[in-house]
Amino acid sequence: MTRLEKIYTDKVAPALNKEFGYKSSMEIPGIKAISLNIGLGEASQNAKLIDGAVEELTAIAGQRAVVTRAKKSIAAFKLREGMPVGSRVTLRRDLMWDFLDKLISFALPRVRDFRGIPDKGFDGRGNFTLGIKELTIFPEIQLDKIEITKGMNVTIVTSAKTDKEGKMLLELLGMPFKK
């Protein structure tokens, strides 16, 4: 059991149950998965960028990332169907808890002028999406190997039914939201 998972079972779940008064312990919101995504529009001209994105995402996540490909051809973007356009990985169980712990404890405090995460990333069903502008905030990324600075989307999928439940779950886990 990871550190953050232990915090969830010992402190967060009882606090959520007390706040919202669930009838069953299975109703208590939890984190189901974390999805990481890098979209690279420049990859249509330079295919080597995709390899770097896959390697960086694999290093950050601890799980092999897959290449995402264009579903349709778009002439304005010089894009053909099947061309690589990004990279993604979905984390579950222990890797998910390890990544969330690393994000909250190490990566977010390394963001320049960090004042907290805006809570506008909730989707209405308790899931939270956060954009990261630079991957260099993660300790696994080696600065000398980076060709271009890339950003990433992090989606935290929860079993919460409302944004209020999802926000409280993440706050109790230590996610630094803006006050």
From Swiss-Prot:
This is Large ribosomal subunit protein uL5. Part of the 50S ribosomal subunit; part of the 5S rRNA/L5/L18/L25 subcomplex. Contacts the 5S rRNA and the P site tRNA. Forms a bridge to the 30S subunit in the 70S ribosome. GO terms for molecular function: rRNA binding; structural constituent of ribosome; tRNA binding. Belongs to the universal ribosomal protein uL5 family. PANTHER family: 60S RIBOSOMAL PROTEIN L11-RELATED (PTHR11994). This is one of the proteins that bind and probably mediate the attachment of the 5S RNA into the large ribosomal subunit, where it forms part of the central protuberance. In the 70S ribosome it contacts protein S13 of the 30S subunit (bridge B1b), connecting the 2 subunits; this bridge is implicated in subunit movement. Contacts the P site tRNA; the 5S rRNA and some of its associated proteins might help stabilize positioning of ribosome-bound tRNAs. The keyword rRNA-binding applies. One of its GO terms (cellular component) is ribonucleoprotein complex. It holds the Pfam family Ribosomal_L5_C. GO terms for biological process: translation. InterPro entries: Ribosomal_uL5 (IPR002132), Ribosomal_uL5_bac-type (IPR020930), Ribosomal_uL5_C (IPR031309), Ribosomal_uL5_CS (IPR020929), Ribosomal_uL5_dom_sf (IPR022803), Ribosomal_uL5_N (IPR031310).
